[in-house]
Amino acid sequence: MITVVDLYHVLTAVVPLYVAMTLAYASVRWWRIFSPDQCSGINRFVALFAVPLLSFHFISTNNPFAMNLRFLAADTLQKLIVLALLALWCRLSARGSLDWLITLFSLSTLPNTLVMGIPLLKGMYAAAADVDSGSLMVQIVVLQCIIWYTLMLFLFEYRGARLLVMEQFPDTAASIVSFRVDSDVVSLAGGGGGAAELQAEAEVGDDGRMRVTVRKSTSSRSEAACSHGTQSHSQSMQPRVSNLSGVEIYSLQSSRNPTPRGSSFNHAEFFNIVGNGKQGDEEKGAAGGGGHSPQPVVGKRKDLHMFVWSSSASPVSERAAAAAAGAVHVFGGGGADHGDAKGAQAYDEYSFGNKNEKDGPTLSKLGSNSTAQLRPKDDGEGMAAAMPPASVMTRLILIMVWRKLIRNPNTYSSLLGVIWSLVSYRWGIEMPAIIARSISILSDAGLGMAMFSLGLFMALQPRIIACGNSLASYAMAVRFLVGPAVMAAASIAVGLRGVLLHIAIVQAALPQGIVPFVFAKEYNVHPNILSTAVIFGMLIALPITLVYYILLGL
């Protein structure tokens, strides 16, 4: 039976977190103490130092040889059940899509265990002699950081790769045998690597197979160079050394944007290949009008074709120009105009990489602002769009996921924490005091700073409920009803009973995790829904978890 003293212990553990969040919110919204730039600096510090060191502290002090495998099995089974049901829904339902699979999986299975779960569950079940609820929450955090967040990145990059292939290679994707991604591109979403656009170059060999190179567009490169104070475009944009001799190059570039934009075609490299003598004629022809397509340059070697385009190009002009030039038809799709979303400042504060990346193309879909639907649409003959071989897509996705992981400080803190805990508890080695205190001086402030940062984020948003009341209600139902229900079923299935079962259910009813929102904003997959789940969910999480705590204790 839950007593008043038990409730007081719970409030003692949780209310200070809400005090820090409220102070941050008031400092921005009411008192105007912090400017958006100052909030960005605070949140950047939290994302890069406070939270990773807090994770390292909890993980490194947890005994990996005393982990409750049955509890972890219940958590894993819950996520696998949800993932399987969502995949089945996407396969059988016309309304199912990869976007909604990712969003619903995040809402139902990825709570804010590190910041809210550890202090809340410690306050609720501190009196349980045979159960260390804090240690159980740390074990959940380890799985989240190492396995489930990595799975989320895999799904997001898979989505980005599908979108890139479907837009740029709608008819010839099955002929792609390899992808090469430049080192400065760290994401396939919305241009990746902090650029507004991606440029894809396809080389077609004698066997008809395509080898695609993905890089930042030259226009975005020149803009970045100009922003760093280069003297001129010609000085900042040195042409790449080309090993092509006598190849045919088709550059088809048009834009839906009404404002002029620098072309992504590298004229310097083009004229180095075909000769400088025709430079004036080519420029004159290019300026003559959009109705004329570039003519292919016939060289001595005709066994290789290179197609260069930008992800923002118009599909209509590309198809017409390709037909006029007699080129192989490999163009299709195109990105929509990029708009600056309100609250983008707040996203930068939580981002671990791509800090200057803009939102990708958006499309209204069920009241949210996710990017285009990724379910392949059937053509007139009912045939679905072909995709590259699974091995090619898998290698591309793994490369991009690896680049994201190595730029995330939480990856290092989690892995180092696990390694140190294994060494420490296996051989009884203690961390040197000078290192331990250097870490603790920041990790001790991690919880408070994380909640303070969340309050700043809430204050910077124009609306608490950004996705509309109906979608917000739907998201809250998934977060606080569906997630705990599936966790209860999974826990009972693996044999959890008593206090362990209660902890598993209450843990599943925690507010939405922040990291899934960061991913959703970066990849533009229903960010408004995840934003509402984080903000509004945090406000109603305490009474909801208390209701679960009281009902389970009856």
Curated annotation (Swiss-Prot):
Keywords, alphabetical: Auxin signaling pathway, Membrane, Transmembrane, Transmembrane helix, Transport
Region listing for Disordered, in residue ranges: 214-240, 275-298, 352-385
Tissue occurrence: Expressed in roots and shoot apex. Expressed in roots, stem bases, stems, leaves and young panicles.
Composition skew (Polar residues), residue ranges: 228-240
Location(s), subcellular: Membrane
Subunit structure: Homodimer.
Protein name per the record: Probable auxin efflux carrier component 1b
Species, as recorded: Oryza sativa subsp. japonica
